[in-house]
Amino acid sequence: MELSEIRNLLEGYAEKINGFRESLDLERLEEEIALLENDMAQPEFWNDQAAAQKVIDESNALKAKYDNYQAMNNMLEEAQTMLEMLQEEADEEMQAELEEMTIALGQKIESYELEIMLNQPYDHMNAVLEIHPGSGGTESQDWGSMLMRMYTRWGEAHGFKVEILDYQDGDVAGLKSVALRFVGRNAYGFLRGEKGVHRLVRISPFDSANRRHTSFTSVDVMPELDDSIEVDVRDADVKMDTFRSGGAGGQNVNKVSTGVRLTHIPTGIVVQSTMDRTQYGNRDKAMAMLKSKLYQLEMDKKQAEVDELRGDQSEISWGSQIRSYVFMPYQLVKDTRTGYETGQISNVMDGELDGFINAYLRWNL
């Protein structure tokens, strides 16, 4: 790498790091960290262990932002000093070291950009992702199961615990619906851009004539609320039905009525949980899902975006799609919002979604 190229890169990095400083408001960040540390030093801090742990997590997250910024800024200053020295006197060994440092700095900046893009109120929370195939029968239901596998692999590769909350088998293959829970910091922040209709074009393995089919499947994503957010749900407003639950792929979880379906009468929202072995456990999980949907609905009303963000896709068809997955006559996955695309469709279906997720977060800033 020539010195002129390194200089241009460092100038661009300096602009980005300066932008980070302005967006972070370092003085305010330092004050917030100091306030949290003061809370943690109080003798009664551990009286409520759950609340204490949340304060610790918040403090650690803010410190990480601050420390990462300082590390990048220090690396930039060191690189700029080395560049000045090399412009005065050539040194191959130092130039090789500077090149490595410049590459490493670029990688740090890219990671930091992603971190600060997760700045929405619920980005840090766990996520519940629901998959609902559209019309199209077995082909659409099989497409739903392919998406379930894709998201599960992505979650596991990124260290999230992935749980099945509810699973309804397809008529012949695939699934009629599934609800997945992603447990880990920033799960909702990473996944929120996946909400929408996903379109598949392929030669259907279920068509003896080997014709090309187009299928649509809806994906919905919502944050899983923690105890700091209270949602009051009146018992009189909720209808509970129980039924025998079956596991993914036809596995029988329990022969008694352990599955729970909750209907919120005022809004018509329906949620269900089937994967716990007890009715009590499924009711708790279904109620948590219902509260998340109701809270999201209320926030959306305040923003006058009920139809878009309620959690129900208006129409599983061409007009509302966010991404196309074309297997035939060529191979291409393209996000219709950001324009990001790749021909590596097998990798995408194996869970390599980072390019799409990162592009959405930047597009949505």
UniProtKB/Swiss-Prot annotation:
SUPFAM superfamilies: Release factor. InterPro entries: PCRF, Pep_chain_release_fac_I, Pep_chain_release_fac_I_sf, PrfB. The modification N5-methylglutamine is found at residue 251. Gene3D superfamilies: 3.30.160.20, 3.30.70.1660, Release factor. Transmembrane segments: none annotated. NCBIfam families: prfB (TIGR00020). This is Peptide chain release factor 2. It comes from Lactococcus lactis subsp. lactis (strain IL1403) (Streptococcus lactis). The lineage of its organism: Bacteria, Bacillati, Bacillota, Bacilli, Lactobacillales.
